[in-house]
From Swiss-Prot:
UniProt KW Chloroplast keyword: yes
Lineage, highest ranks first: Eukaryota, Viridiplantae, Streptophyta, Zygnematophyceae, Zygnematophycidae
Protein's name in the database: NAD(P)H-quinone oxidoreductase subunit 4L, chloroplastic
InterPro entries in UniProt: NADH_UbQ_OxRdtase_chain4L/K, NUOK/Mnh_C1-like
Stated family: Belongs to the complex I subunit 4L family.
Assigned EC number: 7.1.1.-
Membrane topology qualifier: Multi-pass membrane protein
Keyword Metal-binding: no
One GO molecular-function entry: quinone binding
């Protein structure tokens, strides 16, 4: 049973990495980053359930990761929205704002 959860978690994480490498849109990159964090959450919960059913350490870490991911998504989308207002594009290859 643990192997099924770990395979799904690894699959989610790999899809997130692939999307992060391939995507040219910042919004899509943020979505892929969230997918990677969901794979990590599934991994933590699966190991916590498999190793010790009585303690909820893995679930607590997963809740913290979900909270951090929500803050990361809000800040990331605010940055993307600000860049879109200034540049009219959210493509990563056209992002040269930090160049002087």
């Amino acid at each position: 049973m643990l192997q099924n959860y770990l395979c799904v978690a690894a699959y989610l994480f790999c899809i997130g990495i692939y999307g992060l490498i391939i995507s040219r849109s910042m919004v899509r990159a943020l979505m892929c980053l969230e997918l990677m964090l969901n794979g990590v959450n599934l991994n933590l919960v699966a190991f916590a359930t498999y190793l010790d059913n009585q303690e909820i350490k893995g679930q607590v870490f997963a809740v913290f990761i979900i909270a951090i991911a929500a803050a990361e998504a809000a800040i990331g989308l605010a940055i993307v929205l600000n860049i879109y207002r200034n540049r009219n594009s959210v493509r990563v290859d056209q992002f040269d704002i930090l160049k002087w």
